[in-house]
């Protein structure tokens, strides 16, 4: 089961809470609430399910590939997390207001640079009508409705304001938009694998009009996953033939691969699920990169084969250092980066772009209660 970023958001929001406490006082050992019983999944409904849900964890994730009017290329990822107390679904009247964490990364391919920033906030954000209507995390905003998604993220030297229009229907991962694992809980999960995007990028003293393609993921549920050596590799690939590929490889608490699965989405939006253990997907890591910031060794370069689809591609980062270290503790650090794709499909050349997410490679420091 793919439970991307659950540890990241919990670590980030835990960090926010610890920052507000007196550091001279001991931090009590947390009393984790048990996961809720796994319910029977219900059919997703839009626009209602674009908006927030009363579950332990939820996020809206975007990664994109942009060009300015001069042809210069950029990659970005923008994600907002919502965390609720599972015992009362974030009832602020009982002192359990929802917590929010947001992260933004920008890769400037011409300058071979990667910038990043984070924001945190807490408190109820009432929604009027279906969808997600201007969720705020400090000075960043996000809105999501079936016909239009938008966000605004600003840092000291970068501002990206985007409008994104879906060009395909929602892709329900695992065919029904729901996955469950034996020990880690359950999650609803759908993607909008190709959105037409346009907006404004302010980079230093330059203001640039940008456009391109975006991948969006939305997940919510009752789940949790441990950090190093547990973790995952996730791939969101957009091919130039109009199809998309999602791949997830998860590792258990012993660092062993326990699942490899994904989906192939046709140009018309038809989704073909690739189930764990089916033998329909082969993922091989080639090479590694060691972070000068954390000492973590990340995979760097992959070969993917889908024999039934006669698809074979190589995936390579466009910039090696796309590690996200703007949050602490170390369990919240991960690699999220823009990649280039080259290969063949049915004997014909195919290229593409994508984003890869790598978690569980940084050995965390002991937490305050240890």
For each of these PLM feature ranges, what is it?
Residues 1-9:
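Bacterial N-terminal signal peptides that target proteins for export
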Residues 16-19:
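C-terminal motif of bacterial Sec signal peptides marking the signal peptidase cleavage site
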Residues 22-370:
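Structured soluble/peripheral alpha/beta segments that form catalytic or ligand/cofactor-binding pockets
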């Amino acid at each position: 089961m793919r439970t991307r970023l659950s540890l990241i958001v919990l670590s980030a929001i835990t960090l926010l809470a610890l920052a507000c406490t007196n550091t001279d006082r001991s931090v009590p050992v947390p009393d984790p609430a048990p996961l809720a019983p796994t319910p029977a999944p219900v059919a997703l409904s839009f626009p209602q399910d674009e908006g927030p849900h009363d579950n332990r964890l939820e996020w809206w994730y975007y990664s994109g590939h942009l060009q300015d009017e001069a042809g210069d290329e950029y990659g970005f990822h923008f994600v907002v997390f919502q965390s609720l107390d599972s015992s009362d679904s974030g009832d602020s009247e009982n002192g359990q207001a929802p917590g929010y964490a947001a992260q933004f990364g920008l890769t400037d391919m011409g300058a071979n640079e990667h910038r990043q920033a984070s924001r945190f906030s807490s408190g109820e954000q009432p929604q009027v009508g279906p969808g997600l209507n201007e969720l705020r995390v400090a000075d960043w905003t996000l809105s999501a409705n079936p016909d239009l998604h938008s966000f605004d993220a600003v840092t000291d030297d970068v501002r990206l304001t985007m409008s994104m229009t879906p060009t395909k229907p929602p892709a329900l991962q695992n065919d029904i938009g729901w996955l469950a694992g034996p020990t880690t809980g359950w999650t609803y999960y759908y993607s909008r694998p190709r959105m037409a995007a346009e907006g404004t990028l302010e980079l230093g003293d330059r203001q640039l009009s940008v456009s391109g393609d975006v991948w969006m993921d939305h997940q919510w549920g009752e789940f949790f996953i441990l950090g190093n050596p547990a973790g995952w590799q996730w791939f969101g690939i957009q091919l130039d033939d109009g199809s998309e590929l999602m791949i997830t490889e998860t590792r258990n608490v012993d660092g062993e691969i326990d699942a490899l699965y994904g989906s192939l989405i046709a140009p018309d939006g038809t989704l073909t699920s690739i189930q764990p253990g089916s033998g329909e997907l082969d993922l091989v890591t080639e090479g590694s990169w060691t972070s000068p910031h954390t000492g973590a060794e990340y995979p760097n370069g992959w070969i993917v084969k889908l024999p039934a689809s006669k698809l074979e591609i190589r995936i390579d980062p466009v910039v090696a250092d796309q590690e996200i270290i703007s949050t602490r503790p170390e369990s919240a650090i991960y690699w999220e980066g823009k990649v280039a794709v080259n290969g063949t499909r049915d004997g014909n050349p195919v290229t593409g772009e994508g984003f890869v997410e790598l978690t569980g490679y940084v050995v965390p420091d002991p937490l305050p209660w240890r």
